[in-house]
Curated annotation (Swiss-Prot):
Reported phenotype of the disruption mutant: Normal xyloglucan (XyG) levels. Plants missing several xyloglucan synthases (e.g. CSLC4, CSLC5, CSLC6, CSLC8 and CSLC12) have no detectable XyG levels and several associated phenotypes including reduced stems height and leaves area, as well as shorter root hairs and reduced pollen tube formation ability.
An example Gene Ontology biological process: pollen tube development
Lineage, opening ranks: Eukaryota, Viridiplantae, Streptophyta, Embryophyta, Tracheophyta
InterPro entries: Glyco_trans_2-like, Nucleotide-diphossugar_trans
Name the record gives this protein: Probable xyloglucan glycosyltransferase 6
Organism of origin: Arabidopsis thaliana
Pfam families linked to this entry: Glyco_trans_2_3
Quaternary structure, from the entry: Homodimer.
Compartment(s) where it occurs, according to its Swiss-Prot or TrEMBL record: Golgi apparatus membrane
This protein's UniProt keywords: Cell wall biogenesis/degradation, Glycosyltransferase, Golgi apparatus, Membrane, Phosphoprotein, Transferase, Transmembrane, Transmembrane helix
Transmembrane segments: 109-129, 173-193, 491-511, 516-536, 632-651, 657-677
Main location: Golgi
Length: 682
């Protein structure tokens, strides 16, 4: 049966419609007619293909570049890991056992703690794989010997061990909160000072020119400038040069170079430097003690016993690595005018090597907070703070009134500040006057410095506690000095930092009945770290390393605090902080090229004109010196294994925040223990 013509037309029409989707069929009002509009396919723009092709080519190149970067990153990580492994092996092989001291005692204690933690971890791992973490066995239902032992352990742990641990945890949390509130109050005080633009204002100002404009030579007080030093051949030139270029009448200033060096070549270099400045007309004297008793305090005390000191009114003190600006005395001495109760004007430190390595960056965070917040707030609101030992000007009458320099502790600067405050003297801190200095670049030097800074205050607190109670100052000042200055900021801070994060936290992983909240482990410390970094905003990328490193340093600070409190022999050791003279050699060459000294009122790196011959001698002395090497710190390594073992236990308990904190804190202890954080000596 043949199809009708309409059916054939319909099939043809459907084929045409499928070929060209742009064909449109219009039905008019008149049903007898159909209008068909056939549109030709749109022509392809050749530029679009070219653009599409170019885009694909660019994407392929971009992905290839990303792949190469990713591959190089993995290669760098692999090489870094291999380097760390080789470095660790080398330092373990070359390690020398520590001497018998308080640090060795602490190491033995931590080593025993590590053995206990490892045994507990093995026990918990066995229990975990047995499935006892789902249904802990009881003594009555236990069948196997191991199960019986574990059941007994659970009962002893819950009944006898966890309660005292929880009590200690609660005490440390309270101390932690008190210290956090103190830190917050200091920051708010600093904000208030900035908001109200509060700062000490001198009653007079010295003109740019020394004499003239209504100022006579007699208007400049007599000032002694002291530079105590000991075997610091890397930095003696820059400190002597900077002090000799102070903008002050030469007839009204005397520079004392107080050299306690035991090395003969260093003595000769310093003596030659002094003679050259004498030839330039500077009133400068060289003093060397044959009997070096009392360390820095004994050195300063001997210098103040000179007969000519009675003719002077003020004394400025600079350590060997400090370079004061030329207008230092013009900005500090005027504050004494008309303020007879003022004993000390302290200025801020600025660091020439703060970006040298990770260790110096982290130190810069701490010291920026110390000067910007602690010293400034205490200076504005209570006129008392700890003297920093350098970059300050003392009224000689105040030094004599409080008994002068004493050799009873390793923090003679804090000692004399406390005694002066108890005698009724006031202090001023100038945050806008800065002196360049160096930060220790090696972990060994920094560790020794921190040990001295934290053992000395405990010695001093033990010695002057009853003097504080018997003093005639107000009860509020006594309370501030005992509870805030000594107990909270010098004793409680290192105690709870070490106990809470290095002892209690890993123990709570093995004693789950004792709870340490997550906000104590992570959130509050994070907020406190942010507050600490505010004075150094460029250091915000280092907030996590800073938090972890501060917990690591709590071991050293805790050991130093215990040593000073209980009169261990190590608390009386004085070790001069090693300097590298980062700013001396380059400036010496610059001077040799220019042929003249540059005087400036801005902070700059300056040195004396001792000549390139002396520089070559200095370089030869450096090469002939003792070979330096990085050390292995066993206490930190042992604590690293404790924290890493606790992180494994927290992983079994599915405690996320605790696990990550313990893991990264343990890795930080490994890095510090292998001495990988500071200067690396190949």
């Amino acid at each position: 049966m043949s199809r009708s013509q309409n059916e054939e037309f319909q099939q043809w029409w459907n084929k045409q419609r499928d070929r060209n989707n742009h064909d449109v069929l219009y039905a008019g009002d008149d049903e007898a007619f159909l209008t068909v509009e056939i549109r030709t396919p749109a022509t392809v723009d050749p530029d679009k293909d070219r653009i599409r092709t170019r885009t694909v080519r660019q994407l392929s190149r971009l992905y290839l570049l990303k792949f190469k970067q990713l591959a190089s990153s993995f290669l760098w990580i692999g090489n870094s890991f291999l380097y760390l492994v080789r470095t660790a092996n080398r330092r373990i092989a070359n390690d020398n056992p520590p001497s018998v001291s308080s640090s060795a005692r602490l190491y033995r204690l931590i080593k025993g703690f590590l053995v206990v933690v490892v045994l507990l971890l093995c026990f918990e791992l066995a229990a975990y794989f047995k499935g006892w973490h789902f249904t802990p066995p009881s003594v009555a239902s236990a069948e196997v010997a191991v199960e019986v032992v574990y059941a007994w352990w659970l009962e002893i742990r819950a009944s006898y061990l966890a309660p005292p641990l929880q009590s200690l945890t609660n005490v440390c949390i309270v101390l932690f909160l008190i210290q956090s509130v103190d830190r917050l109050v200091l920051v708010l005080g600093c904000f208030w000072i900035k908001l109200r633009r509060i700062k000490p204002v001198a009653s007079m100002e010295y003109p740019t020119k020394l004499v003239g404009e209504g100022v006579r030579l007699e208007d400049y007080p007599m000032v002694i400038v002291q530079i105590p030093m000991c075997n610091e051949k890397e930095v003696y030139q820059q400190s002597i040069g900077a002090v000799c270029m102070l903008d002050w009448p030469r007839e009204r200033m005397l520079v004392q170079v107080l050299d306690d060096s035991s090395e003969l070549d260093v003595q000769q270099l310093i003596k030659a430097e002094v003679q050259k400045w004498q030839q330039r007309g500077v009133r400068i004297v060289y003093r060397h003690r044959l009997i070096r008793t009392g360390y820095k305090a004994g050195n300063l005390k001997a210098a103040m016993n000179c007969e000519y000191v009675k003719d002077y009114e003020f004394v400025a003190i600079f350590d060997a690595d400090f370079q004061p600006p030329a207008d230092f005395l013009k900005k500090t001495v005027p504050h004494f005018k008309g303020n007879e109760e003022l004993a000390l004007v302290q200025t801020r430190w600025a660091f020439v090597n703060k970006d040298e390595n990770l260790l110096t960056r982290l130190q810069n965070i701490n010291l920026s907070f110390h000067f910007e917040v602690e010293q400034q707030v205490n200076g504005v609101f209570i006129n008392f703070f700890g003297f920093n030992g350098t970059a300050g000007v003392w009224r000689i009458k105040a030094l004599e009134d409080c008994g002068g320099w004493l050799e009873r502790t390793t923090v003679e600067d804090m000692d004399i500040a406390v005694r002066a405050h108890l005698c009724g003297w006031k202090f001023i801190y100038l945050n806008d006057v800065k002196c360049l200095c160096e930060l220790p670049e090696s972990y060994e030097a920094y560790k020794k410095q921190q040990y001295r800074w934290h053992s000395g205050p405990m010695q001093l607190f033990r010695l002057c506690f009853f003097d504080i109670l018997r003093s005639k100052v107000s009860a509020a000042k006594k309370a501030n000095m005992i509870f805030l200055f000594f107990l909270l900021r010098k004793l409680i801070l290192p105690f709870y930092s070490f106990t809470l994060f290095c002892v209690i936290l890993p123990l709570t992983m093995f004693f789950p009945e004792a709870n340490l909240p997550s906000w104590v482990v992570c959130y509050i410390p994070g907020i406190m770290s942010i507050l600490n970094i505010i004075p150094a905003p460029r250091s915000f990328p280092f907030i996590v390393p800073y938090l972890l490193f501060e917990n690591t340093m709590s071991v050293t600070k805790f050991g130093a605090m215990i040593s000073g409190l209980f009169k261990f022999d190590s608390s009386y050791e004085w070790v001069v902080t090693k300097k590298l003279g980062r700013s001396s050699e380059a400036d010496l060459v610059a001077y040799a090229e220019s042929g003249s000294l540059v005087e400036s009122t801005t902070i700059q790196r300056s040195s004396s004109d001792s000549g390139l011959t002396e520089l070559s001698k200095l370089g030869a002395a450096k090469k002939a010196g003792k070979t330096k090497r990085n050390r292995l710190y066993r206490t930190e390594i042992a604590l690293a294994f404790i924290l890493l073992a606790a992180s494994v236990r927290s992983l079994l308990s599915a405690q996320g925040i605790h696990f990550y904190f313990l893991l990264f804190q343990g890795i930080t202890f490994v890095i510090v223990g292998l001495d990988l954080i500071g200067e690396q000596v190949s």
